[in-house]
Amino acid sequence: MRRLPTREVVEMKMVVAVIRPEKLECVKKALEERGFVGMTVTEVKGRGEQKGIRLQFRGREVEVDLLQKTKVEVVVSDDAVDEVVEAIVSSARTGKFGDGRIFVIPVEKSVKIRTGEEEV
Amino acid sequence: MSDGNVAWILASTALVMLMVPGVGFFYAGMVRRKNAVNMIALSFISLIITVLLWIFYGYSVSFGNDISGIIGGLNYALLSGVKGEDLLFMMYQMMFAAVTIAILTSAIAERAKVSSFILLSALWLTFVYAPFAHWLWGGGWLAKLGALDFAGGMVVHISSGFAALAVAMTIGKRAGFEEYSIEPHSIPLTLIGAALLWFGWFGFNGGSALAANDVAINAVVVTNTSAAVAGFVWMVIGWIKGKPGSLGIVSGAIAGLAAITPAAGFVDVKGAIVIGLVAGIVCYLAMDFRIKKKIDESLDAWAIHGIGGLWGSVAVGILANPEVNGYAGLLFGNPQLLVSQLIAVASTTAYAFLVTLILAKAVDAAVGLRVSSQEEYVGLDLSQHEEVAYT
């Protein structure tokens, strides 16, 4: 059975940031300036710890449950995680509720589809 | 009025009505998705408020018996005595007023309470739009002075454009305006709006001949020409700076349409080319100036309609060709028309800005123009309408 070519073992992490949609350009720029170009961006809806936002609509209280957010996913080597997190925090923060969250997740391996090359 | 003329004005009325949601779509594409419904809704609200006020007293104070050249009387209130052709004219003019208020919503994009907008638009129609309509079209002091405004360079575009600047300065910038780039959420929606506007403008300018005649034909031809020339100018500017974005191209076309509006029944095609060319340049520079000065007149009613209408109104005094409609401008040996146009432009510009500033500050003080920061964050679709544009 043919084995796919492999590379050296590099600890990888996925940094997942859920941010305000309007902060996407700032975050992209901050990451690019630090040399992190690759990313996956998804439009999502979500809610944080405060569950939702209560607003008075037409004389009655309504909970706005899920708000429009943007999810940015970046896969980097373990030693670059702190720099990526710092870049996202500094560029996405407004100081108000709803600035978002960052999660750091271990990545087992990555396969480049064009070449079949693996990173583990 | 012949049956053909009646048919053309009926059709033109429908064309101008379609421009109202056209403005809504044009603007909605340029805001964030959480405010798209609100921008379109504001255009329909503009139409509804205008229809009601126009019937009650708006038409009368615009076109009723002249009182000292300043305002019309209440002799046509609730359309009493308005019949036949006058009823058709009333309806046609109603749509102009509605479009003008819809244009003004540029200034409050993504941050105004609907209730406050209703109050402001009612006051604005009464104290800015109606006087302008009377001054220029209802036998008021500017008409007596000899100033010309074929289809609304001053009545519609200067009024809404300079009012938008005043309202934007009163309501303040959108949250995050200086922190990050607020991007359009749907360029196709804006392009649909632009298509409706260009289409409707044939009724806006062509219908202002108030007959299906040679002046109407000329108006439609020069309207189309100016739009294309100004759109081309913005396309070239886009190429010089990078790529010719569709948003820029249609914004340029709208600038050309705004600029030709006061002149459509007075200039020939050569004049229209000049008007479109200059409009493309000056409106772009105005937009650039607004951005550099960090003024959040969000969707550029001032730069495109205000400055476009101002230039077009001055251009009438220079380029009016007597072969088109009997009126001669500076280039055809009549400097007096330019003097009249300059007086009219100066007075309408100053009045629109200052009176709107007073009205906006009064509404803000009384009920508050702006939604809460939390409502702005959630978006106006949810906080003002309990709806979303896209699920």
From Swiss-Prot, chain A:
Superkingdom: Archaea
Any single GO CC term annotated in Swiss-Prot or TrEMBL for this entry: cytosol
A molecular function GO annotation: enzyme regulator activity
Keyword Metal-binding: no
Entry keyword set: ATP-binding, Cytoplasm, Nucleotide-binding
Binding locations of ATP: T40, G48, E49, Q50, V75, G98, D99, G100, R101
Pfam families: P-II
InterPro entries tied to this protein: N-reg_PII, N-reg_PII-like_a/b, N-reg_PII/ATP_PRibTrfase_C, N-reg_PII_CS
Localization per record: Cytoplasm
GO biological process, one term: regulation of nitrogen utilization
Keyword hit for Cytoplasm: yes
Binding site for ADP: T40, G48, E49, Q50, V75, G98, D99, G100, R101
Family of the protein in this entry: Belongs to the P(II) protein family.
Oligomeric form and interacting partners: Homotrimer. Interacts and forms a complex with Amt1.
Role description: Involved in the regulation of nitrogen metabolism. Regulates the activity of its targets by protein-protein interaction in response to the nitrogen status of the cell. Regulates the activity of the ammonia channel Amt1 via direct interaction.
PANTHER family: NITROGEN REGULATORY PROTEIN P-II, NITROGEN REGULATORY PROTEIN P-II HOMOLOG
Record-given protein name: Nitrogen regulatory protein GlnK1
From Swiss-Prot, chain B:
Superkingdom per UniProt: Archaea
Membrane topology (Cytoplasmic): 28-38, 107-113, 171-188, 238-245, 288-300, 364-391
Similarity comment text for this entry: Belongs to the ammonia transporter channel (TC 1.A.11.2) family.
Protein name in the entry: Ammonium transporter Amt1
pH dependence: Transport is pH-dependent, with a steep decline at pH values about 5.0.
Keywords noted in UniProt: Ammonia transport, Cell membrane, Membrane, Transmembrane, Transmembrane helix, Transport
Membrane disposition: Multi-pass membrane protein
